[in-house]
Amino acid sequence: MALVKVKPTSPGRRGVVQVVNASLHKGKPFAALVEAKSGNAGRNNNGRITVRHQGGGHKQAYRVIDFKRNKDGIPAKVERLEYDPNRTANIALLCYADGERRYIIANKGMVVGQPIMSGSEAPIKSGNALPIRNIPVGTTICCVEMLPGKGAQLARSAGTSVQLLAREGTYAQIRLRSGEVRRVHVECRATIGEVGNEEHNLRKIGKAGAMRWRGVRPTVRGTAMNPVDHPHGGGEGRTGEGRVPVNPWGQPTKGYRTRSNKRTNSMIVQRRHKR
């Protein structure tokens, strides 16, 4: 994997920095693990925008990823590494001893031919998935479940990882990249190591059109809108907000807490905000 600065043959190419990985598979994905993916342009079932700045972009196919890692005791080998347009991390195609194939999130340092195992008896090696009760304290892990058997939800993006801090009874404490310390059940599964493609954040897109290819639409300032469209809108000429900065729905944007799931507050030992 390397960072390549593109030759400035045009204004759109000037400044572009790409992440090049020669080990990625250059053909089509494994057909049995590919599903159709329809875009929703950030709209919900009522047709209203719930996520701004989404729409358009190149047509994508969804790769079915095995986030549960529940094929225990059967050894597998990494058949190939692939690019996945649906996430920042790369993915790996595993071929199990019984012939089944599954996609997983590719770990840092994962290579073709590497042996992979899942289950409580799996060795503590990068890429193997185990219940947290079988992982030594202090180990760097990724793809962590929040509920046993639900599938990985934490630390799935490129270059991310979680540190296992302690185990007390039926719960373990983990530190997320944000600094938050959280409790998870010891039966939750996690993958040893950290997610690969760690140089993803060092790339430079170069032009607006490249973001449109990815399905990202422009972000318009609230002060440039009309009053009917945004609380910051209106006024003659260029004007400031004239109030505490808010989003289009009037909710404060500077440090205002929006977490509403009070049911799991007890699982957060230390918030990412130290205040």
Curated annotation (Swiss-Prot):
Keyword flag Membrane: no
Claim: Transport is one of the keywords in the record: no
GO CC field: large ribosomal subunit
Protein family (similarity comment): Belongs to the universal ribosomal protein uL2 family.
PANTHER family: LARGE RIBOSOMAL SUBUNIT PROTEIN UL2M, RIBOSOMAL PROTEIN L2
NCBIfam families: rplB_bact
Name of the molecule in the record: Large ribosomal subunit protein uL2
